[in-house]
Amino acid sequence: MILNPKHIKIQDFNYDLPDKRIAKFPLPVRDQSKLLLYQHGKVSEDIFTSLPSYINKGELMVFNNTKVIQARIHFRKETGALIEVFCLEPIEPTDYALNFQQTEHAAWLCLIGNLKKWKGELLSREMIVKGRLIKLTAERKEAVGTSHWVDFRWNNKKVTFADILEVFGELPIPPYLNRDTQESDKVTYQTVYSKIKGSVAAPTAGLHFTQRVLDALKEKGVDMEELTLHVGAGTFKPVKSEEIEGHEMHTEWISVSKSTIESLIHHGGKAIAVGTTSVRTLESLYHMGVTLILHPDASDEQLKVKQWQPYELPASAKDISSVDALQALLDYMNRHELDTLHSSTQIIIDPGYQYQVVKAMVTNFHQPQSTLLLLVSAFVQGDWHTIYDYALSHNFRFLSYGDSSFIIP
């Protein structure tokens, strides 16, 4: 076991990824992608439609039902300069659902493309929304780190901010695809079970699932639950520090229903996670429960999982089971009469991390020197090279629109 995960060198997680191995577009049929199987150190391959045959009746699979929003809005100044306003997370109001229902005004934390050309003047643009000509304006407020507070206003009480994004916005696709968003991406860059708007990137392991695969899982008797983690742009943030200690993880918002937590407890506190976002959410739930066991009166703020929290637990927390932690979380929800837990996580999963809830995962192939590759390495006790060497030598497609793997450590 690595004694101090903070001192892991990111260079140790590098590999050569030729550009031709990065899938620029998805396959015509989602579930015909290749599936790498890593089972207790042994590697083989199949196609994704066969996934249900590797999962036992009565096991629990957990999916992230977030939906990607059309977060990129372009404004052209009178000078001709193009400004991109990339919506990251809501500020006024901070609740995603409430913000999307706002009329006439909404405020978001945004990344600004071509910032030097935006001197602070009001940007505006007109488009037809619901049969009406709508003028949208954007006003840049104060900087928040590398982002900015942006006030959006529009001149119609019957048009919501969700409507605004649907018409004025463009779906953001990963920067490493090196291409413009196409109309087809509106369908192919969403999971078939996406429901809750808020992500600026798709939980891409889920892109392989079709209704046919979901039906096959159901017919086999596999239990399925959903949770929500809104994927932030930070998921593409490269690790620039030599050691992981110098990398600040992005915070992401999560929502988990009481019924999902009850189901997790019923399944012995163990689940198969679909995608790294589900992994991070499930493991964060464990650490929220641990916080409640150690501090029964913990506030909402104290429940939010911090980056290095899992590695700094007191000795008294080392033997807390996933069932006990999840039960503490369920008791907390019952006390506060909550049907859904809303919180956030900044968790980083490095080699040295002890997985508590996730017993298997479906995941795509990740970028070299990324925190997601660290997460996979932690899951297979450092054996990530076995997986990636096989994928590279057997013509697997990489990254968001690429193939996937099913990992049982």
Positions of PLM-derived features:
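Surface-exposed, charge/polar-rich loops and edge strands
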Residues: 1-409
